[in-house]
A protein has these predicted regions:
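A cross-taxa feature marking solvent-exposed loop/turn segments within ectodomains of secreted
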Residues: 44-46, 90
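Transition segment at domain starts
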Residues: 1-31, 104, 108-111
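Asparagine-centered strand-capping/turn motif at beta-strand->loop junctions
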Residues: 38-43
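Short, solvent-exposed, Trp/other aromatic-anchored flexible loops in extracytoplasmic proteins
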Residues: 64-103
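Short, acidic, Ser/Thr-enriched surface-loop or helix-capping motifs
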Residues: 57-58, 74
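Short beta-strand and strand-turn-strand segments in soluble, beta-rich domains
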Residues: 16, 46-48, 58-68
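Beta-strand signatures of extracellular beta-sandwich domains
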Residues: 50-54
Length: 112
């Protein structure tokens, strides 16, 4: 039996330690989306923040995955709005921080 495509998982663990997420599902012009706010709770700024949105069925199984880009850098203690189209309306969604880069204070360099 053929195996389906591999599922994405966050590239950096413990994103919930550094960021807060609030989201809800919606419809914009007849298209399904997930939108919300991400907050940076850590002492460094973050950029190139990407979110992983899992579309879930009634049993909690993943039916689709979407990568969403946060449109702004997140200085420490700030929040930013995000919005992402999803392939189709799902029973529920799971949103997690997929990847990001830290910005060192003052130099604009990223942390390894």
């Amino acid at each position: 039996m053929a195996q389906g495509p591999a599922r994405l998982t966050p590239l950096v663990v413990e994103g919930e330690r550094y960021f807060t997420l609030q989201w809800q599902a919606g419809d914009t012009n007849g298209r399904s989306d997930v939108h919300g706010v991400i907050g940076n709770e850590f002492g460094f700024g973050a950029r190139k923040v990407r979110l992983l949105i899992d579309s879930l069925d009634a049993a909690g199984g993943v039916t689709a995955q979407t990568i969403a880009y946060v449109p702004f850098d997140l200085p420490p203690g700030t929040r930013s709005y995000f919005e992402a189209r999803v392939p189709a309306r799902a029973t529920s969604y799971r949103v997690s921080v997929f990847a990001w880069e830290w910005i060192q204070a003052g130099g604009g360099e990223t942390l390894p």
